Amino acid sequence: MKKRIAIVLFNLGGPKNLESVKPFLFNLFYDKAIINLPNPFRYIIAKIISTTRERKSQKIYSLIGGKSSLLQETEEQKLALTEKLKQLIKEDFAIFINMRYSAPFAKEVIDQIKKYNPSEIILLPLYPQFSSTTTGSSVKNFLQNFDIDISIKTICCYPQEEDFIKSHVSLIKEKLYDDDKNFRILFSAHGLPEKIIKAGDPYSFQIKETVKAIVKELNIKDLDYKITYQSRVGPIEWLKPNTEDEIELAGKLKKDIIIVPISFVSEHVETLVELDIEYKLIADKYEVQYTRIPTLGTNKIFINSLTNILLQFINKVDTNLVTSSSSTRICPNEFTKCLCKLTN
């Protein structure tokens, strides 16, 4: 009997207009994976943050058309992935998008899946590196709303997948300065509070694994590069070094800067405003060249990567499987928040 497969793409979500900025912020900060407090405290804090940050965030989104581009970009990735899979598999399939903090929410997507009536479901996060705050939160939220007895296969991460790495390398090579060896590559990832990592989250470990693989594939002798973290907010300790600080340092050294958004596969406010506008101003102050590598988007090699991962999971007979794209747990056992089973 031919399989009928529902594929669910997970992503963050974003406001579709300036009026939806506040509810988006509330949903984000009401997530227990983001603010780990019981109610009513988490609710109150989410209300306060979303209210106090609304106007500032609206001004930021007004710089990029008054909405998040991530919504449209995810639709384009869905279409590209659909076309690629149609060429390669005979099974019936449909791809659904589930955003975590804006529509389409899990309940709505699950209703659509029920109507489709699949024989199995594959969950594919558009977060290459796992974190309990991104993939972990999305998977948990989906499963909490899910009430059908059906096989679910979960792809937890793909930080070292061959074509994922090659897609980054191809975009970096397009922008490398042929006549300039005096540059520094900053691999900029979304930041997280240190306490989340100390609690067993493998995110920074997987970021390092991605960068290690990219640097190896680039094969540039004595490459000057650093891993940095952006979007730091509040007084608590965040992952270091901070992207802004490292741009400042490179500028003082008169090094040209190449920024690679290493944890983002879609353009959104953190790339289009933080990287392209705010951080570029720092480089401009020191009169050094500043080049930002695009996110992977619908890059053909990246779509090949997602396709390869899905084909691998479609062909697996295991039911209710949770593993990385390499079919093994890649995180050391100290990272207790990893979704994969512990290794012996």
UniProtKB/Swiss-Prot annotation:
It is an enzyme of class 4 (lyase). Its main location: cytoplasm. Keywords: Cytoplasm, Heme biosynthesis, Iron, Lyase, Metal-binding, Porphyrin biosynthesis. It is found in: Cytoplasm. One of its GO terms (cellular component) is cytoplasm. InterPro entries: Ferrochelatase, Ferrochelatase_AS, Ferrochelatase_C, Ferrochelatase_N. Pathway: Porphyrin-containing compound metabolism; protoheme biosynthesis; protoheme from protoporphyrin-IX: step 1/1. Fe cation binds at H190, E270. GO terms for biological process: heme biosynthetic process. CDD domains: Ferrochelatase_C, Ferrochelatase_N. SUPFAM superfamilies: Chelatase. Its EC number is 4.98.1.1. It comes from the Bacteria. It catalyses: heme b + 2 H(+) = protoporphyrin IX + Fe(2+). Catalyzes the ferrous insertion into protoporphyrin IX. HAMAP family: Ferrochelatase. Belongs to the ferrochelatase family. This is Ferrochelatase. It comes from Rickettsia felis (strain ATCC VR-1525 / URRWXCal2). The gene is hemH.
